[in-house]
């Protein structure tokens, strides 16, 4: 029996004004160990039916595996999936993207014997509908991405070692569909101009590790003014994080997790955590998480 271990990091997307195009990989992982035997292989249609019968916690990985078979028009063996989920589900930390990547990676490796990250990113984007979580999860670090008719386009951007991340994770879920439903179709032109400026300041602040530049980038008109109504405690938590010294506070992806970016030394970041939790609303957990620079990792044994 052959085995493949696939480690996929969590991601935080948007980072405020980088709506649907900016993402950052984090050192929290979902790990899938996939086992299979060579021999009998199933058609894509058979794999699709098999995937629907898998346990809930493995179903997304199995579905992505069958999707790979259908997209490549190949027969693949059945797989056993041992899944360790350390990324909170439906919290805006890219958990669905990790499952899609794991299933597609399994199919790609069994089919080709290697990992082609460019192809993997295209397939994941096709399956997920957008690359803002998939790109940093696969490539690691801070990634700017966009989708076009030929597939996703990405670029890794510099992120200073003085940038530290804090996650405020609630004990409730928020579906991406619900968060998308509250967004307007249009925003005023003057707000779009301010958004562009904030995005530029955000990128420069991340590259230079500058608190002042990041504060200028702590602005969004595309999603947070509308999604905050789904989180009654958002304003309270955002004020707390800013008062404690965070440079940027934003929803992580579609929420409900709230991201705080701090520009300073590691010692200063260590001192920040006790201040934040001192007046934390009930039902919220603080996690200080390192930035992940390696992205997707796989081991065959």
Question: Where does each model-flagged region fall?
Answer:
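Glycine-rich beta-alpha junction loops
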Residues: 28, 38, 141, 169-174, ...
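Alpha/beta catalytic cores of group-transfer enzymes, especially the acyltransferase/condensing modules
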Residues: 115-162, 249, 255
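Glycine-rich, charge-dense phosphate/pyrophosphate-binding loop(s)
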Residues: 206-301
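Acyltransferase
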Residues: 162-239, 243-244
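Solvent-exposed alpha-helices and their adjacent loops that cap or buttress functional pockets
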Residues: 12-14, 23-26, 73-74, 127-128, ...
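Short beta-strand-to-turn element immediately C-terminal to the catalytic PLP-Schiff-base lysine
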Residues: 34-35, 137-139, 143-148, 259-263, ...
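DPxDG-like acidic metal-binding loop motif
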Residues: 28, 93-115, 138-143
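ATP-binding N-lobe of GHMP and related small-molecule kinases
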Residues: 1-91, 109-115, 291-294, 301
């Amino acid at each position: 029996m052959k085995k493949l271990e696939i480690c996929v990091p969590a991601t935080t997307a948007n980072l405020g004004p980088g709506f649907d195009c900016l993402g950052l990989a984090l050192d929290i992982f979902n790990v899938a160990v996939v086992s299979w035997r060579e021999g009998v292989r199933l058609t894509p249609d058979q794999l699709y039916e098999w995937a629907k019968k898998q346990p809930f916690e493995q179903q997304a990985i199995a579905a992505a595996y069958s999707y790979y078979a259908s997209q490549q028009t190949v027969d693949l063996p059945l797989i056993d999936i041992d899944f360790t989920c350390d990324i909170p589900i439906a919290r805006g930390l890219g958990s669905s993207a990790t499952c899609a990547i794991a299933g597609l990676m399994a199919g790609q490796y069994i089919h080709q014997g290697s990992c082609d990250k460019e192809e993997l990113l295209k397939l994941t984007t096709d399956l997920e509908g957008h690359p803002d979580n998939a790109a940093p999860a696969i490539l690691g670090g801070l990634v700017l991405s966009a989708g076009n008719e030929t597939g996703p386009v990405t670029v890794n951007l510099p992120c200073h070692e003085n940038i530290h991340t804090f996650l405020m994770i609630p004990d409730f879920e928020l579906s991406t569909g619900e968060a998308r439903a509250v967004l307007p179709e249009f925003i005023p032109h003057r707000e779009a101009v301010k958004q562009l400026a904030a995005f530029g300041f955000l990128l420069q602040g991340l590259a230079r590790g500058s608190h002042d530049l990041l504060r200028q980038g702590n602005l969004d008109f595309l999603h947070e003014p509308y999604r905050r109504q789904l989180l009654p405690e958002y304003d309270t938590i955002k004020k707390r994080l800013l008062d404690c010294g965070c440079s940027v506070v934003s929803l992580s992806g579609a929420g409900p997790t709230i991201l705080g970016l701090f520009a300073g030394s590691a010692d200063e970041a260590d001192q920040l955590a006790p201040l934040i939790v001192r007046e934390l609303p009930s039902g919220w957990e603080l996690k200080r998480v390192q930035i992940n620079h390696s992205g997707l990792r796989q081991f065959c044994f």
